[in-house]
Amino acid sequence: MKRILTIISAAAALLSVASCNLEKFPSTAINSEEAMESVADCKAFRNGLYSGLKYAFTGAYVYYTDLQTDLFHAVKNFGNWGGPFYSYNVTASEDAATSIWFGLYGYIGNANFLIAGTEKLLASGTLDEADTKTVQQYYGEACYIRAHLLFNLSQYFCEDYDPETAGTKFGVPVVTKYAPTADSDKYPHRGTLETTYEQIVKDLDEAEKYVTAAGTVNSAYVTKDVVTARQARVALTMHDYETALLKAKTLIDSGTYKLMSDATAYAKGWVNDNLTETIWRIAMTGPDDYGNTYGYFIYNTTGEEGNDDPQYIPEDWVLDLYDQENDIRYDAYFDEREVSLRFTGTVTLFVKYPGNPTLYSKVSNYAHMPKVFRISEMYLIAAEAAYNIGGQDAVACKYLNDLRAKRIAGYEAQNYNGTALRNEIRD
């Protein structure tokens, strides 16, 4: 009997030890409640947040929307790559669409985690003045990134914003807390488009308050100028044309970002991702650190001349929008090349994304650092906003002419008005 009790006691002790081991936190993991206890922790999570953005702003997140706009024509043997988007047959079960949806919400989750961590640290009262400003900057950046990604989701999955109907149209789920779950019953409702944009504007207001880093050309991080650029784009989308014009004009007038006019420098700038007019460029460091790619438009597995095998080529009407002799954008974006298809000959290809040589070792992987905002967009936002305000056609023309004068050699300013002006801005 004594032996039996001894065995039972020993077994109980083993079960107790096993139970304790099961309850121990894995040595290779971090408790989310204790993940951000210092400025260094916040910086590490901030770096991780930015690292994810190289996927959110490249590849399918960019070109699937282009394929839906009739800018490109699929070659005969394109293998149905991107076919559902090209043929307007995207359904809720389309893997690429769901990947974009879940991908962006994953990055929003990362932003929410950083926001919560910085708020906790700021409320702790343990930071000195310098560290407080640093953590506030990180907080503002995370608020900005959440707003940016929510806006992108609304562009992909919602109708165009109309102030008259935004309160009755579907938006996207607004998620502001880090609470990952596989329980779909806990997922928030889509809500209205108005609610979605209210959160976007609120986050941008927070970013404007706490992001104090000055803008620099090709900044890898969110700066005050990045926030202003997004405010301009959001305001234009919301039909708040006065704000859109004001924000765009602020960046133009700052003189920090110069429009490029040299054809060689402009073309090389797209190849090497060093355009001097870029407000925000997501950093990539080399062949082992890049985002999604753009292989559909060239796709050459050997790197040898004549072996280009594109799935899509630009439509003729797109090429005709450019002054092919004098516009510096034409040779940077397009090139007539021999191709390896079901015929032998030359075709004008879209070569805006040939691959940055620093991001591959032998044959191009067609990877590039995303240039999220450029000053050229601010000129177009200013022009369209001025046109829509009414009575400011001359102002709109000025911004359009200023942009074209830098892009087209020998360009002479034009005096457009009305619908003709609107069409010229959009083209």
What are these regions (language model features)?
Residues G82-F157, G191, E208-A213, V363-P370, ...:
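Conserved, well-structured interaction surfaces
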Residues C20-T69, D309, Y322-Q324, C397, ...:
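Membrane-proximal, proline-rich intrinsically disordered regions
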Residues Y197, Y241, Q392-D393:
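TPR-repeat structural position
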Residues R3, A10-A40, I200, A232, ...:
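Bacterial Sec-dependent N-terminal signal peptides
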Residues S32-E33, Y61-K76, L127-A130, F157-V172, ...:
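Short, surface-exposed recognition loops and adjoining beta-strand edges that mediate ligand/DNA contacts
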Residues A44, T243-I375, A409, R422:
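Hydrophobic-face positions in mid-chain alpha helices that act as interaction patches
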